[in-house]
A protein has these predicted regions:
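Residues on the lipid-exposed face of transmembrane beta-strands in outer-membrane beta-barrel proteins
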Residues: 153, 165, 259-263, 295-299, ...
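Short secondary-structure subsegments characteristic of cysteine-rich extracellular domains
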Residues: 286-300, 540-550, 921-932
Length: 966
C-alpha cells in the first residue's frame, strides 16, 4: 500500500498535536458538587442536557465494553454492536451530524480520547455522564459536535483499607441461528429449480440423482433423491450431510476477575486494581483477552491553617489486550458452503469443492488457518496533576496526560489444497503501529459568593499532540510452516516493506462563567478558541461559544407552599461545537512516487516518458504524480444546537424525570470532492460544502419508593429524532455515497436513505402477467414490480425512496426490586419503526441470489412459490435471474423493530453474621441472563433485527457472579 508524501503539520508556534486533553477540577469544598466534567457543578445548577448512568447498572450487563452496556439507558444515544468477543460498539448521540466520523469524544479522568472503550476495565468506573447539548459540550470545542461522554474512575475514600473482589463466569450460546438447507433439502430445492427452468435435474454435476415423474395433472413429482457415495473420481471426498454452523460454532465462555484495594486519610487517598477478562466467542477460535492494572492516587503535600495549599495526584491504567478476530464475511461463507461436502477427506485432509461445486474455502479449515492471526495491543493511559490553592476560592491546576498504544500482529498465509481450491503461497506479514498522544494544560478557577449571588469562573490553555507511526514487512516461501519459524527473516521468497507516519497539533484557549441568583436564576457562558494543524492557513482557528439559562421554578414564592413539588427547572441553551475528524493531511497537495511505466487496460499510468518512442522501450525511471489538491481555506465543521429542557420531581422526588427538545444543524461539512477530468490527474480535493439537520425529543421518567422492607425503582426513557441532509454538492448528493443509490439526490432526505423498486407481489397467473406493465423477466412465480409512473413500462423511472435508517423512536425500561437481602433487576431495550435492508434475504429467498450456482441457501426456499404452492410470496426457484430480483427493492426492506430483554438478574446479599464468620464486610452472589428474549416484527424474516445480516451473532449469556468486600 502506498502512502502520500510531502506533508507537514505545524501551527505557527507549536508542532502538530493530537487530542485535546481535558481535566477534572476540584472545586471549593463549601460548594457541594455532584456532576463532574471539565469543571464541576452542582446538579441543581446545571443548565445543559446531561444524562448520568449508574456504573452498578452497567455491571449487571456483564459486558466487556462499558459503553456497549449503556444501550437503551440514555435517551437520544443510539448504540449498535454485534456479539464479537471484544465488544466494539458504534455510538451516536442525537443523530448523525456529519458525513465523516460521528463518534463522540470520551473524557476519562480529564484525558480525552476517541480510542476503543473495550480496553477500559468497567469495574474501575465511578461515574459516567453524557453531555448532549452544545452548552454542556462546547467547552470541549472542536471535537464535541458528536457529544461528549465523561468517565470518572474510582479513587480511595477516607477510612480503613478496603479490598473488593468480583468474579463472574458466563456461558454463551446462540440466541438466534440461521436456518439453512441440509443435504437432502438442498437436493430437493435444486431439483425444483431445474424443473422450473425446463432443465434435466440429473445433469446437475454435484452427484445428486433424482427419480421423478409427472402426475396426471402434468405437475412434476419427486419420488426419491440419492447421491453418489463419493463426490470425486478419486474416491477421497465422500458425500455428506454437514451442518456447517455446528462445525464452526461452540458454546462460548466468559471469565472475569477483578480485585481492588483502596485507602484514604486526611493526607490523601489511593486506589489500586487488577483485572482479567477472557471471552471465548461462539465462533470457533475467536476470542478476546484483557489484562488491566490501575493506580489512582491523590496526596496533600502542604497544609497551612487547615487549608490544603498543594495537592498532587495521578490516574494511570496499563492494559494489555489480544484478540483473534473471526474472518471477514465468515457467516456468509458458512451459509453458502454446500452441506453435501464433508469436513475432511478420507485421508484426513480438509475437504473442498470438487466437480461442479463452487470455489469456496472449507469454513472449518478457514477458521483453523485464521487462528494464529492474533494481535496484541498495549495501552497506557492517564495523567499527573499539580493543584495549588493559594487564596480562598482561587485554584490553579496543571495537568500532563498521555495516551500511548502499541499494536503488534503477524498475519499468516498458509497453503490451501481443498479440492478445486488450491493456492501454494505461504508467507507472513509482520505489522506494528504506535500511537502517541500527549497533552498539557493549565487552568485557573475562582469562586465568589455574596448574599443571593453565587458565581464561579474558569480560564485555561491546553496543548495537544498526536502521532501515528506504522510499518509492515512481508516475506514469502517458508520451509517450515509454524508460528515459531515464520518470521520475516526466515523466508526465502519475495520481500515487501511498507510504512508511514503522520500527526497533528491542537492548541486551545477556553473560559467559562457560571452565575446563580437566589438559587432560582441560572446563567452559564462558555467560550473556546481552538487552532488545529488539520486545517488550511486561512481558517486554522475557530471560536465555539455557548450560553445557557436555567429557572428553578419551584423556588419561586408562588410555589413555595406546594408541598408535593420538589423540583421544577426550566432550561434553555444555545451553542456551537466543532468537528475536525478528517485526515491529518486533508489540506495538503499530495504527490506519490510512481516509477517506470505502469500499464492497465492498454493505458499507461506511469510518470516516465518514453524517450525512444518505441512504446515500451527506454524510460526515465523517475517521477511523481499528484493525488490530491491542497486547500488553504479548509476549516472546521460547525454544529449549532438549541436545547430546551424541563426537569421535574414530585412527591419527595419519588416521581422524577426530564424532557428535552433539541434542534441542531451542522454546516461546512467536510467533503472529499472528486476531481473532473478537464482539471487533470489528482484534482480531487477536500472542501467545506455540506449541511445536515437533526431534531428530536427525549423523555426520561422514574418512580421509586418503598413499602416496608420492599424497595422499588422503575425508570424508563424514550427518544426520537429526525435527520435530513439539506445541502451537498450536486455530484456527491446524487452519486449514492450517502444515500439515493445514484438514482436520486439525497438532499432533503435522511442520510443513507435509499431509492429502489416497489415489490408488488408474485405473478400467480398468466392473466396477471398479461395485465401488468411491460416487465423484462416477468413470469409465473416471479416478483412483480410496481409501475409507479403509470407509463406501462418497468424501468428506472419506477423507483422511489424506500429505506430510512432513522427509527421512529428508541426506548429503555429498567425495573429494580429489593426485599430484605434479595434483589431483582430486569432491563428491556428496544427500537421501534426502523428499516433494515436484509442482504441475508437474497440467500434465503433467491436460488440465483449471487448468480453463482450450487451455493447453499436458507430453508425459506422450501416454501417458494410453485403451481402447487400458489399462496407463497417467496419467488419461484430458478437457476437464472432473468427478472433481476436482486435489485434494490422493498422486498429486502424489512421492519427492524425489536424489544430485547437485555438483562434479568437475581441477587442475594448474605447476612452480617455469615459475613463476619468469613471475615468479610459484604458478600453477594447473583445469577443473570443477557439477551434472553427478543420480540421482533412478525414480518421480519431474518435472524436478529439488531444484527440483521452477517455480523458476529449476539449470544445469549447465563452468568454466575460473586462480589465480596473485606
Amino acid at each position: 500500500m502506498k502512502r502520500p508524501l510531502f506533508y507537514s503539520s505545524v501551527l505557527p508556534f507549536f508542532r502538530s498535536s493530537a487530542h485535546l486533553f481535558t481535566l477534572l477540577l476540584t472545586p471549593p469544598s463549601r460548594f457541594p458538587r455532584e456532576l463532574k466534567g471539565y469543571t464541576t457543578q452542582r446538579k441543581s445548577d446545571l443548565t445543559g442536557a446531561v444524562s448520568v448512568v449508574s456504573p452498578s447498572d452497567l455491571a449487571k450487563q456483564n459486558e466487556n465494553n462499558p459503553i456497549k452496556a449503556m444501550q437503551g439507558r440514555v435517551p437520544g444515544m443510539n448504540i449498535s454492536a454485534d456479539g464479537s468477543p471484544s465488544g466494539n460498539a458504534t455510538v451516536r448521540i442525537r443523530g448523525v451530524g456529519t458525513l465523516n466520523n460521528n463518534d463522540p469524544l470520551y473524557i476519562i479522568d480529564g484525558v480525552p480520547t476517541k480510542a476503543g472503550m473495550h480496553e477500559l476495565n468497567g469495574n474501575d468506573i465511578e461515574s459516567i455522564q453524557v453531555l448532549k447539548d452544545a452548552a454542556s459540550a462546547s467547552i470541549y470545542g472542536s471535537r464535541a459536535a458528536n457529544g461528549v461522554i465523561i468517565i470518572t474512575t474510582k479513587k480511595g475514600k477516607d477510612g480503613k483499607v478496603r479490598i473488593d473482589f468480583d468474579a463472574s463466569i458466563a456461558v454463551q450460546t446462540y440466541a438466534h441461528k440461521m436456518e439453512v438447507l441440509n443435504a437432502k433439502e438442498f437436493g430437493q430445492v435444486m431439483w425444483q429449480g431445474y424443473v422450473n427452468d425446463g432443465l434435466d435435474p440429473n445433469s446437475n454435476g454435484l452427484g445428486y440423482k433424482y427419480d421423478w415423474t409427472y402426475n396426471a395433472q402434468g405437475q412434476p413429482v419427486l419420488n426419491n433423491i440419492s447421491m453418489s457415495k463419493y463426490l470425486d473420481a478419486a474416491g477421497t471426498t465422500p458425500a455428506a450431510d454437514t451442518d456447517w454452523f455446528a462445525e464452526t460454532t461452540r458454546n462460548g465462555l466468559i471469565q472475569q476477575y477483578n480485585v481492588s484495594l483502596s485507602n484514604g486519610s486526611e493526607r490523601g487517598t489511593s486506589f489500586f486494581s487488577l483485572g482479567y477478562y477472557k471471552n471465548k466467542g461462539i465462533i470457533n477460535s475467536s476470542d478476546f483477552e484483557r489484562y488491566s492494572a490501575r493506580m489512582n492516587t491523590e496526596y496533600k503535600l502542604l497544609k497551612i491553617n487547615d487549608k490544603n495549599l498543594v495537592t498532587v495526584g495521578e490516574h494511570f491504567t496499563l492494559n494489555r489486550t489480544s484478540e483473534v478476530v473471526a474472518p471477514g464475511g465468515f457467516l456468509q461463507n458458512v451459509l453458502q458452503f454446500n452441506p453435501s461436502l464433508p469436513v475432511y477427506t478420507t485421508d484426513g485432509q480438509y475437504a473442498g469443492p470438487v466437480g461442479g461445486y463452487p470455489d469456496r474455502e472449507n469454513p472449518v479449515a478457514r477458521l483453523d488457518r485464521n487462528s494464529d492471526n492474533r494481535y496484541s495491543y498495549w495501552r497506557t493511559f492517564g495523567d499527573v496533576f499539580l493543584n495549588i490553592n493559594p487564596l480562598k476560592d482561587f485554584n490553579i491546576k496543571t495537568t500532563f496526560g498521555i495516551d500511548y498504544a502499541q499494536k503488534q500482529q503477524r498475519i499468516f498465509t498458509y497453503p490451501v489444497t481443498e479440492g478445486t481450491v488450491a493456492n501454494a503461497t505461504n508467507g507472513v506479514e509482520a505489522k506494528q503501529e504506535h500511537w502517541t498522544k500527549w497533552m498539557w494544560n493549565a487552568i485557573a478557577t475562582y469562586a465568589f459568593e455574596k448574599g443571593s449571588h453565587r458565581a464561579d469562573a474558569m480560564v485555561g490553555i491546553e496543548l495537544n499532540r498526536e502521532d501515528d507511526v506504522w510499518f509492515s514487512g512481508k516475506k514469502y516461501d517458508y520451509a517450515v510452516l509454524t508460528t515459531d519459524y515464520m518470521w520475516p527473516n526466515a523466508g526465502v521468497g519475495e520481500a515487501e516493506a511498507y510504512g508511514s507516519g503522520e500527526g497533528y497539533t491542537l492548541v486551545s484557549y477556553f473560559g467559562k462563567l457560571n452565575y446563580n441568583f437566589a438559587d432560582r436564576y441560572l446563567l452559564s457562558l462558555t467560550m473556546r478558541y481552538d487552532g488545529s494543524s488539520r486545517f488550511g492557513k486561512n481558517n486554522r482557528y475557530g471560536i465555539f461559544p455557548s450560553v445557557s439559562f436555567g429557572w428553578r421554578i419551584n423556588e419561586e414564592k408562588f410555589l413555595k407552599d406546594v408541598s408535593w413539588l420538589d423540583n421544577l427547572k426550566l432550561r434553555a441553551s444555545w451553542g456551537q461545537t466543532g468537528n475536525q475528524e478528517i485526515s491529518n493531511i486533508a489540506r495538503y497537495t499530495l504527490y506519490e512516487s510512481n516509477y517506470g511505466e505502469a500499464n492497465f487496460g492498454g493505458q499507461s499510468y506511469g510518470t516516465s516518458y518514453d524517450i525512444a518512442g518505441t512504446n515500451g522501450g527506454q524510460t526515465l525511471p523517475s517521477g511523481f504524480k499528484r493525488n490530491q489538491l491542497g486547500n488553504d481555506d479548509l476549516k472546521w465543521e460547525t454544529t449549532t444546537q438549541t436545547n430546551i429542557g424541563l426537569d421535574f420531581g414530585i412527591l419527595r422526588n419519588s416521581i422524577y424525570g426530564s424532557l428535552e427538545w433539541y434542534f441542531k444543524k451542522t454546516k461546512d461539512i467536510l467533503v472529499y470532492m472528486p476531481g473532473i477530468g478537464v482539471m487533470g490527474e489528482g484534482s480531487s480535493q477536500w472542501i467545506n460544502a455540506g449541511e445536515v439537520e437533526n431534531k428530536g425529543i427525549e423523555l426520561n421518567v422514574g418512580y421509586r419508593g418503598n413499602i416496608g422492607d420492599f424497595q422499588y425503582d422503575l425508570s424508563g426513557n424514550i427518544g426520537t429524532y429526525r435527520n435530513k441532509v439539506t445541502k451537498l454538492p450536486e455530484t456527491i448528493a446524487a452519486n449514492g455515497t450517502f444515500g439515493g443509490n445514484g438514482v436520486e439526490s439525497v438532499v432533503g432526505h435522511p442520510m443513507y436513505s435509499q431509492v429502489g423498486y416497489v415489490y408488488d407481489g408474485i405473478f400467480k397467473s398468466q392473466e396477471e402477467i398479461d395485465n401488468h406493465a411491460t416487465q423484462n423477466g416477468a413470469g409465473l412465480g416471479r416478483i412483480r414490480w410496481k409501475d409507479l409512473n403509470g407509463d406501462g413500462i418497468i424501468n428506472e423511472a419506477d423507483q422511489q425512496w424506500i429505506y430510512d435508517p432513522t427509527p421512529d423512536f428508541t426506548w429503555g425500561l429498567n425495573i429494580y426490586l429489593q426485599y430484605k437481602s434479595f434483589d431483582f433487576t430486569m432491563f428491556w431495550q428496544g427500537v421501534q419503526g426502523v428499516d433494515v435492508i436484509s442482504d441475508l434475504k437474497k440467500e434465503t429467498d433467491l436460488w440465483s441470489g449471487l448468480n453463482i450456482s450450487n451455493l447453499n441457501k436458507g430453508r425459506r426456499l422450501l416454501d417458494a412459490w410453485s403451481p402447487t404452492n400458489n399462496g407463497s410470496n417467496i419467488p419461484a426457484i430458478s437457476t437464472m435471474d432473468n427478472n433481476n430480483e436482486k435489485r434494490v427493492s422493498t422486498y429486502f426492506v424489512e421492519n427492524g423493530s425489536f424489544a430485547k430483554l437485555r438483562t434479568i438478574q437475581f441477587g442475594y446479599n448474605f447476612p452480617k453474621n455469615i459475613c463476619e464468620k468469613l471475615y468479610a464486610e459484604r458478600l453477594r452472589m447473583y445469577i443473570s441472563a443477557q439477551n434472553l428474549l427478543t420480540i421482533s416484527s412478525k414480518n421480519f424474516t431474518g435472524v436478529d433485527p439488531e444484527n440483521a445480516n452477517y455480523g458476529y451473532p449476539i449470544p445469549l449469556n447465563i452468568t454466575f457472579g460473586l462480589n465480596v468486600s473485606f
